[in-house]
Curated annotation (Swiss-Prot):
Protein family per UniProt: Belongs to the RimP family.
Protein's name according to its UniProt entry: Ribosome maturation factor RimP
Gene3D superfamilies hit by this protein: Ribosome maturation factor RimP, C-terminal domain, RimP-like superfamily, N-terminal
Swiss-Prot/TrEMBL GO biological process terms: ribosomal small subunit assembly; translation
Lineage: Bacteria, Pseudomonadati, Thermodesulfobacteriota, Desulfuromonadia, Geobacterales
Disulfide bridge positions per record: none
Stored CDD domains: YlxS_C
InterPro entries, per database record: Ribosome_maturation_RimP (IPR003728), RimP_C (IPR028998), RimP_C_sf (IPR036847), RimP_N (IPR028989), RimP_N_sf (IPR035956)
One Pfam short name: DUF150_C
Function: Required for maturation of 30S ribosomal subunits.
One term under GO cellular component: cytosol
Amino acid sequence: MAKVDVISRVTVLAEQVISSLGMELVDLEYKREGREMVLRLFVDKEGGVNLDDCASVSRELSEVLDVEDVISEHYSLEVSSPGIDRPLKKVEDFQRFKGRLVKIRTFEPLPDDAGNKRKTFLGELKGIENGVVLVALKEGQNAAIPFEKVAKANLEFEF
């Protein structure tokens, strides 16, 4: 099975297992590290996840992956929290983390409300309306970024 097909199939199975445990799949990676393939999942829930949550996901998902035989080669399974710089991937994430400091990178330069074009936006997430991510920038301007133009978005740690 091609890598993209493995990722797609594992994502479906992982989302089923993780949601049944009251958590959400934030991100999934399947890549070679050294001589070994690593399947890394990042999970979260309201209030955050702990070691027992990660162990439960690992145990349950391992059983499902073994039965479904999705990955034919040897791999390591890692399950962890997304960390303080959690990626924002879904439309719902941009509403859920409203009020938090975010860093957003876009596929192409976009203007802020002062007309300055940039690809990196850092500021307070104001939410998402009609598919447009709203950010109050650190420099005082505002930005309205179409969701489909977001290449990468992460929460930023505030000191």
